[in-house]
Amino acid sequence: MERPAFRARQLPVLSLAAFVLSVPVLAAPTYPWRDQPVDAASTLAARVAAPKGFQRAPAAGGSFAEWLRGLPLKPDGAPVLLYTGEAKARQDVHVAVVDVDVGNRDLQQCADAVMRLRAEWLYSSGRAREVAFNDTAGKRLRFSASAQQDYAAFRKFMVNVFAFAGTASLERELKVVEPQAIAVGDVFIKGGFPGHAVLVADVVVNAEGQPRFLLLQSYMPAQEVHVLKNPKSEDGSPWYGLDFGPQLVTPEWNFGRTALRRWP
């Protein structure tokens, strides 16, 4: 008996537009203190190139790492300004200035700037309910749920955090992490009165998996957040390596090797 001719099943044809629409699109990082979108050419990742032979470590979409890499920088050569609007006395410690306001009070210093950036990321990611920090006495300061859609209220809350929290309280609420496991968003911190804290703003790795990292800081008195130079670098690179021995030497503070912390 003759078999019927085989006929291929016709499948629906999807247009390119339909395919594109079916792929989820991750929103670009946002920076609520800005009125305008960030120019891609002015971001930290665009302006501070990875050293030769290194590539930026992977970062998930929407992560703190992605957000930090997208931070807007002021034009090349910009000075670090104090909260008073005056130039900081030392202009030899930075390679770039982050385009984020410092306020008009002597509050947004070292740990304050670290907490500000962490909180801004949470707020901009729709996670304002997670914005909370311990004060020096150990009390948990939480952003009011009733004000979570109000950026002005968020900024007012952060001023309160700056007044009652600092390096001593922040160090206690962060988790100890070994330098070999360093990641974007980690913090080198020494709690005290005074103490100091710097934020790991980026991490790159080479083919052998060896990392290098960038650091951000504010300092005393309150001043603009800036990308630190590496005073030990022989070629002027701002990238730090893990071969720093018992102390991590930064331009204005030295940290012990056990000073690295991570957000819980």
Locate the predicted segments by residue.
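Bacterial N-terminal signal peptides that target proteins for export
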Residues: 2-15
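Bacterial N-terminal signal peptides
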Residues: 12-24
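Cationic-aromatic interfacial patches
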Residues: 29-99, 108
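Extracellular-facing segments of soluble proteins and assemblies that are Gly/Ser/Thr-biased and enriched
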Residues: 99-180
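Structural motif
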Residues: 183-187
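Short coil-to-beta-strand transition motifs
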Residues: 189-197
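Catalytic Cys-His active-site segments of thiol-dependent hydrolases/isopeptidases
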Residues: 190, 201-228
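Low-complexity, Gly/Ser/Thr/Pro-rich intrinsically disordered linker/tail segments
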Residues: 218-264
